[in-house]
Amino acid sequence: MMKQRISIFLLFTILLSANGYAQKAIMRLTQQTLMHEVRETPSPLDGQHITVNPPRFMWPDKFPHLGAVLDGVEEEDYKPEVTYRIRIARDPEFKSEVITAERKWAFFNPFKLFEKGKWYWQYAYVDKDGKEEWSPVSHFYIDEHIRTFNPPSQQEVLAKLPKTHPRILLDAKDWDNIIERNKNNPEAQAYIRKADKCLNHPLKHLEEEIDTTQVVKLTNIVQYRSALIRESRKIVDREEANIEAMVRAYLLTKNEVYYKEGIKRLSEILSWKNSKYFAGDFNRSTILSMSTSAYDAWYNLLTPDEKKLLLRTIRENGKKFYHEYVNHLENRIADNHVWQMTFRILNMAAFATYGELPMASTWVDYCYNEWVSRLPGLNTDGGWHNGDSYFQVNLRTLIEVPAFYSRISGFDFFADPWYNNNAFYVIYQQPPFSKSAGQGNSHESKLKPNGTRVGYADALARECNNPWAAAYVRTILQKEPDIMEKTFLGKSGDLTWYRCITKKALPKEGPTLAELPMAKVFNETGIGTMNTSLGDTDKNAMLSFRSSSYGSTSHALANQNAFNTFYGGKAIFYSSGHRTGFTDDHCMYSYRNTRAHNSILVNGMTQKIGTEGYGWIPRWYEAVSYTHLTLPTTERV
């Protein structure tokens, strides 16, 4: 008991000692922001020493585009088509051995390793008359011991893409083997049971299902549209689960009854697009996702009219998403819904219809190159700046997209170091049976790791052969063996299908969580946790903190220099408020606001909401008996 008290005391003294230490080596930043909502500087920067070979090249849009504020509140702003050119060489005059490219978006992947030394690069905007507007010449360095990560080019990937269907949810050549492997798999049988229930429950029209009793009372147009979309999504998401179950039931059995009922049900859903209750990019992406799954899985059974219907739906919705993304997504600090789901959905639609829908080739080009350029994480430390709850909305994308690329190309996309770093984020931000560390919107709802988080850790363990992720999974499954079943068919995070088709096994039992360091800081993301007993949640005292260069943009909160404390997996000194929306008074003044968190109000002033209200973690130290960190003074309004 005495050791526990000492440990808890040490955790609390970290914050008390931080200011005194900071006086010895003061750091001052004067920039208004460390991050741009929309890119304002090129990458690589002039004089930069590159961290990965080959480098990824990105530059500001000629016509910067912020996009809609909220889902369903779209704006018809001007975003013209553009053309860019780029050149890269060893000499600043670009006279010999020049790498050149022309792109319709503001990024370029060379897909070739660069020799060590100094390189020069430059980009240009090309107007409609062909006139080039070149940027200043920048230089960068490729150092001797640089890390390499060089995925295959788009052309190499497409050369290996199967021309048969199905090819998205599974590869046709492995189909019979997958059926055989899953005959006695309880998770596979869950799809069949779900599909069988749908056979006996006819579908009603959207207007008969949606509950608008509360929506009609709202007078604010933003709140009205937001509430209407939430209610319609409940119905659309429910039906998405039904269609996806019937698609997978067919793939697991080849029983055509699931196709016949499924296409009938899907045809009704597709008629909802003209309803006044149907709006928002999540609903549109759901339509695109269902149509893609049905087209690819039932391709050999579809009638000509059914194929036309699905291809038309894919074309109409895919075109809208592509137009929204191009010259927007690549230069945004983050785009919530796109990273969470809609990018994955457009990517799968593109590869499913490549060679059969002319514009799919452009979608493939954009999506694949965008993933290589910026994803999976928006930095390298494995953290998630949007917080733990919204991290979990990205889980299917983080696994299914690279798993698909790896399957068709033979290249291991999970070899990106971000994934092994992210395994530590999963563990430290929410240890087994513990409440979330408390960052980002809806953090308060994450009382303990749920099935999607455990399923994601399971996939990381398999794909990366990561012993720590495997230990996390085994620790939780010992007490909750059915935890992954509880999130079956979850829209954004369920990885049941991944487990049904993968041949990769969970690593053999190895080290335990007790062998991990007690503290972990993700300094690029600006978060960290300290623990006393990671291997035993009941006895673990934990402190979490945040001071982030991302500020409070997106789903992040205005909680720079804030901390939370926990014991036995339960919150002791914790943030207040509840996620009630994105724009309501409680959210803005008593949830996202600094006063809802364990930080300091300087002269009663709260932190700015946006990238301007930033912090950072200048340094931290960890030893056997203590951990020490230094936090900055926070930007205020």
Predicted regions and their residues:
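Catalytic and substrate-binding regions of extracellular carbohydrate-active enzymes
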Residues: 486-629
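Aromatic-lined, polymer-binding surfaces characteristic
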Residues: 182, 191, 224-430, 435
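Extracellular fibronectin type III
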Residues: 130-142
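Single conserved hydrophobic/aromatic residue that forms the stacking wall/gate
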Residues: 628-637
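Recognizes extended acidic, P/S/T-rich segments that occur
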Residues: 78-114
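Pro/Thr/Ser/Gly-rich low-complexity, intrinsically disordered linker/stalk tracts
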Residues: 24-69
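Low-complexity, Pro/Ser/Thr- and charge-rich linker/hinge segments at domain boundaries
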Residues: 141-169
